[in-house]
Amino acid sequence: MVHTKEAVLMLDTPSESGESCVLGSTILRSQIVRIQFCSKMPLEVCQGEMWDVSAAHDRSILAWAKKVFISSKLLYELYIASDTKIKLQNARGLFWGYENLCEINLDKWIDSSSVSDMSYMFCGCHSLKKLDVSGLDTSNVVNMEGMFYWCSKFQTLDVSYFDTSHVINMKSMFDYCSSLKKLDLS
């Protein structure tokens, strides 16, 4: 998986009529407990278990899922890998409805510099207690409506480094974040 050109993640917006699958797979969003963005694939992952999630369908971004059983329930850890930073074109509803998601690592592998819409990006991530969004570039974002809507287990959230100079819509951005005790906007 050696690519020198830009690696753009496919659009993955949830359906409005019901539960959606993850990035073109048959796995439901509600079955994901962890998302890890990374640069390399472990050796134990074979080609048959990976699928292409790049917008160009050029295998510049690959994903695979590892089965985990929690309380006898089949769930998955999702891994997304690329040799370069993964560029987002649009983040609207990107993680919407991942209701069992407990951990997501956005870290250094995401390039959101050209994203203008982050509305409902983490909407309905009920199980997520903490989230590090310090790596998100929000300098071109105009819409943050409902970005953290219904993230009911967040206790603290630091968005102090968000560049909101172009944002025109923040409606319901933190609605139903019922456990939120500390919100850093400074």
Residue ranges and their predicted role:
Residues 1-186:
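Negatively charged
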